[in-house]
A protein has these predicted regions:
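Conserved glycine-rich Rossmann-like NAD(P)H-binding loop of the short-chain dehydrogenase/reductase
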Residues: 1-11
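Substrate-binding pocket helix/loop in short-chain dehydrogenase/reductase
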Residues: 36, 64-65, 69-74, 175
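Active-site helix of classical SDR
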Residues: 88, 128, 136
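Alpha-helical segment proximal to the catalytic Tyr-Lys
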Residues: 93-94, 141-142, 203
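Residue(s) in the substrate-gating loop at a strand-loop-helix junction
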Residues: 109
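Short C-terminal tail/terminal secondary-structure segment
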Residues: 114, 195, 206-223
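Short, small/polar-rich loop/turn modules that mediate ligand/substrate recognition or access, typified
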Residues: 144, 149, 205-207
């Protein structure tokens, strides 16, 4: 597993250890090309091969489109799209393609499937997640002959560092008002979907976007 902060990784490693799971970690900043290369080098050195890749790094920025800083736009695109491409490219070329096997799981968002009102001010985030959706489908078509499946999870509202401000500002009642299941996601709700895409239970599923959103997109699609 990997993220920017070693302290967070150590904590996660210890948590998994209490459950009898042996985990290794590599600290890396996926917004930096050199860190991505080092991450792949170190992971292959530790593991020998990489069969499952979960592209989970992401960032957002809130600003009106007409005043959106170009630096902020580039930051979101660099982490949410460019790093995902580079990591998939390197792991595919160096491990999955030679081994004729791979499971790639990209974290998209329902924000990448539709527009949003001016209240959200997340033009860069929405655009980047739309790119993740297209990337997932394109890569699935391109790498299918190598035995590699590529799918994406598209979460709705989940509590996280990224959404904390929105939850506090908007309030839980408003956030769940349009959700058929009348709740936002919790820490368990993505696990089963991720396990499906990571396992051979999904060996004939590729290029798919699975919404984990309590039914939000189902309601929007029918309206």
């Amino acid at each position: 597993m990997s993220s920017r902060k070693a302290a967070d990784l150590k904590e996660a490693q210890a948590h998994l250890g209490t459950r009898g799971i042996r985990a290794q970690w590599i600290a890396a900043d996926n917004s930096k090309d050199d860190d991505i290369s080092r991450l792949v080098d170190d992971a292959l050195a530790k593991l020998g091969r990489i069969d499952i890749l979960v592209n989970n790094a992401g960032a957002t920025w809130g600003a009106p489109t007409e005043d959106h800083p170009i630096e902020a736009w580039d930051k979101v695109m660099n982490l949410n799209v460019r790093s995902l491409f580079l990591l998939s490219q390197q792991i595919g070329k160096r491990s999955m393609i030679p081994n004729r096997y791979g499971r790639i799981i990209n974290l998209a968002s329902i924000a990448g499937l539709r527009g949003s009102t001016s209240a959200t001010q997340t033009i860069a985030y929405n655009t980047s997640k739309g790119a993740v959706v297209s990337f997932t489908r394109a890569l699935a078509g391109g790498w299918g002959p190598y035995g590699i499946t590529v799918n994406a999870l598209a979460p709705g509202m989940f509590p996280s560092k990224m959404t904390r401000g929105t939850i506090e500002q908007v309030g839980m009642d408003k956030l769940t008002a349009g959700v058929p299941l009348q709740r936002i996601g919790d820490e368990d709700d993505l696990k089963g979907a991720a396990l499906l895409f990571a396992s051979d239970a999904s060996k004939h599923i590729t290029g798919q976007i699975l919404c984990v959103d309590g039914g939000v997109t189902a309601v929007l699609s029918s309206s």
